Design a protein with these regions (language model features):
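Bacterial N-terminal signal peptides
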Residues: 9-18
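N-terminal leader/linker segments that initiate helical-solenoid repeat arrays
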Residues: 22-71, 253-254, 259
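Amphipathic alpha-helical repeat scaffolds of TPR domains
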Residues: 27-41, 63-74, 98-117, 137-147, ...
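Conserved structural position within tetratricopeptide repeats
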Residues: 57-60, 91-94, 137, 144, ...
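Alpha-helical linker/edge segments of TPR/alpha-solenoid repeat scaffolds
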Residues: 78-84, 112-123, 156-175, 210-219, ...
Length: 259
């Protein structure tokens, strides 16, 4: 999730850094200013959500509506609350139908929470593809949330948004057991992303392993292990998967009968 966190951190900066400067552009009522300041000074994620809802409820026409809903979506995603993440993502799309952050969150989180034997699996995966393709279409021209964000930084964020969309499609393809298609999507995510996420290499390795492309799978797991930003969890999984790949290669090399 390195790539996703980078994009989220940039977007979260809209609220932390951007609101005071926006107040200077358009005077707000004292009550709204105080309510928004409460969002910025909240100490815990739950306090932030409460403060955001206070603004949205009591100042329904606030010009910061989309920014605050997006912030709430990101908070709930980081908390791991899938239902609330979807709630805010859908709410954000209602307000801004082309919002790439919301499209990517819906695609990625739905793919992550879909299981092989879900009765509505294909319905969920069709939505994943729809959201991810819309994100891919919108990311290259996604407007800056703040004019003072450097062009190079925003260009990197746009690339990471495209990578996140490809990764969501890769997860959907894996759930359909279309492993070659899945691997192609993960390779696209790696190629286009400005931030290299070792978790994507892990997913690529698994797709290649499932496709019985053992040499390529081993290479992907090696790259995940070698990534400077690989977490201990990623390294542990990559090591286990490397061992699994090596055992399968050894088994495939044995002649019939195991002699």
């Amino acid at each position: 999730m390195t790539r996703f966190r980078r994009v989220c951190a940039l977007a979260a900066g809209i609220v932390v850094l951007g609101l005071p400067s926006l107040w200077a552009q358009k005077p707000k009522s004292k009550g709204e200013v105080a309510a928004i300041q409460a969002v910025q000074t909240a100490k815990t994620p739950d306090e932030q959500i409460k403060a955001i809802e206070n603004v949205l409820t009591n100042f329904a026409d606030t010009e910061f509506k989309n920014v605050l809903i997006q912030m709430a979506m990101q908070i709930e995603e980081q908390k791991g609350d899938f239902a609330q993440t979807v709630f805010y993502a859908e709410r954000l799309l209602d307000a801004d139908p082309k919002n790439v952050f919301a499209l990517n969150v819906l695609a990625s989180e739905t793919a992550r929470h879909t299981r092989e034997f879900d009765l509505d699996k294909e319905e969920k995966l069709a939505k994943v593809d729809k959201w991810a393709k819309a994100a891919l279409e919108g990311a290259p021209t996604a407007p800056k949330p703040r004019a003072d964000i450097p062009d190079a930084q925003w260009d990197g964020a746009r690339k990471d948004m495209q990578a996140q969309a490809y990764e969501a499609m890769g997860m959907a393809a894996s759930l359909r057991k279309k492993y070659d298609e899945s691997a192609a999507d993960y390779k696209q995510a790696i190629a286009v992303g400005a931030t290299q996420d070792p978790a994507t290499q892990l997913r690529l390795g698994q797709a290649l392993l499932d496709a019985n492309k053992l040499d390529e799978a081993a290479d992907a797991f090696d790259k995940a292990l070698a990534a400077p930003n690989a977490t201990p969890q990623v390294k542990s999984i990559a090591t286990a998967k490397k061992d699994e790949t090596a055992k399968r290669k050894a088994g495939a090399a044995k002649p019939p009968g195991g002699f």
